Amino acid sequence: RGTLQAQVHVLHTACAIAPQDRGLLLVVRGAWTLQGEDGTTQCAAEQGVWRDGEPRAWQLTPVGDAAVLLWVHLYQTSL
């Protein structure tokens, strides 16, 4: 039996995320380009992507100077 823990990162600049099997990418302000192994998605504020399953890597690129994205990495821990 296990539980999930979260690490929350606030992003303002482009970055690459190593493969992870669960998490949330949520645009808070502006727009971001989310490039994953299965395609590219453009997300505006209050939009994002949720993953739970097969690990995926991401390349995240802000569109404009004021863009902000939350990356919530969820990972399993034992009790």
Regions found by a protein language model. Give the residues of each.
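Glycine- and acidic-residue-biased ligand/ion/polar-headgroup-sensing regions
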Residues: 1, 19-38, 46
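Ligand-binding loop in jelly-roll beta-barrel domains
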Residues: 1-4, 42, 53-79
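Conserved short histidine dyad/triad with adjacent acidic residue
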Residues: 1-20
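Generic preference for hydrophobic/aromatic residues in regular secondary structure cores
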Residues: 6-8, 25, 36, 69
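Short acidic-glycine-tyrosine-enriched beta hairpin
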Residues: 13-16, 36-56
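Ordered hydrophobic segments in well-structured contexts
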Residues: 22-28, 47-50, 67-75
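Short, surface-exposed loop and linker segments with low hydrophobicity and enrichment for Pro/Ser/Thr
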Residues: 14-25, 58-67
